[in-house]
């Protein structure tokens, strides 16, 4: 005798749609989980990129703050260093004893200049150059026809820069062509 299963054909037919529904439900759940995983992965990657950008920005800001702190400290040393240079300029007109002292101070001044050089601070000369508002501050203007307009005639304080960026602009006297009104008034006086 052969045994037949107790399931009828109606039961088999009803179980098939049930398994189709289950399959569709599972596929839908799988698709939903994949979408959720992709969304969370995208959010994770975005957060990771934001964290990396923040780290880089903070590092850059820290470097800039250190650079500006060093620049400000160096700027504080410029006036006394320049005063020492001026004083040493007069040492040759004094006694031998003062000249000997001046030699020692000249060595100290050279050490200061070496520190500036090591930090990338460069002194720039302006006399005879064309006025550049990025590098110069015009504190005096002299009207003249002998020298091209915008030429720096005299430098009152030296300029210093690190790389291409000035940390202290040079204070200068600039040549300017006389204005027509000034020539007329000069001619009338003569």
Curated annotation (Swiss-Prot):
GO CC aspect terms: cytoplasm
GO annotation terms (biological process): protein folding
Pfam family for this entry, one: GrpE
Record-annotated disulphide pairs: none
Polar residues: compositionally biased ranges: 1-31
Subcellular location: Cytoplasm
Annotated spans, Disordered: 1-34
Keyword terms, alphabetized: Chaperone, Cytoplasm, Stress response
CDD domains: GrpE
Assembly information from the UniProt record: Homodimer.
Biological role: Participates actively in the response to hyperosmotic and heat shock by preventing the aggregation of stress-denatured proteins, in association with DnaK and GrpE. It is the nucleotide exchange factor for DnaK and may function as a thermosensor. Unfolded proteins bind initially to DnaJ; upon interaction with the DnaJ-bound protein, DnaK hydrolyzes its bound ATP, resulting in the formation of a stable complex. GrpE releases ADP from DnaK; ATP binding to DnaK triggers the release of the substrate protein, thus completing the reaction cycle.
Family to which this protein belongs: Belongs to the GrpE family.
Protein name as annotated: Protein GrpE
Organism: Chlamydia muridarum (strain MoPn / Nigg)
Organism classification: Bacteria, Pseudomonadati, Chlamydiota, Chlamydiia, Chlamydiales
């Amino acid at each position: 005798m052969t045994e037949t299963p107790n399931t009828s054909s109606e039961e088999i037919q009803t179980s098939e749609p049930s398994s189709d529904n289950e399959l569709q439900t599972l596929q839908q759940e799988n698709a939903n989980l994949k979408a959720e995983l992709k969304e969370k992965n995208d959010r994770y990657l975005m957060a990771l990129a934001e964290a990396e950008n923040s780290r880089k920005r903070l590092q850059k800001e820290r470097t800039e703050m250190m650079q500006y702190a060093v620049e400000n400290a160096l700027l504080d040393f410029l006036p006394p260093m320049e005063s020492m240079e001026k004083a040493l300029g007069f040492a040759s007109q004094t006694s031998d004893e003062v000249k000997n002292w001046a030699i020692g101070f000249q060595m100290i001044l050279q050490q200061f200049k070496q520190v500036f050089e090591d930090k990338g601070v460069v002194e720039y000369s302006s006399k005879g150059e064309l006025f550049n508002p990025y590098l110069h501050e015009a504190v005096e203007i002299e009207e003249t026809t002998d020298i091209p307009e915008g030429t720096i005639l005299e430098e009152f304080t030296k300029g210093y820069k690190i790389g291409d960026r000035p940390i202290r602009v040079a204070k200068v006297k600039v040549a300017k062509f006389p204005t027509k009104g000034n020539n007329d008034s000069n001619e009338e006086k003569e």
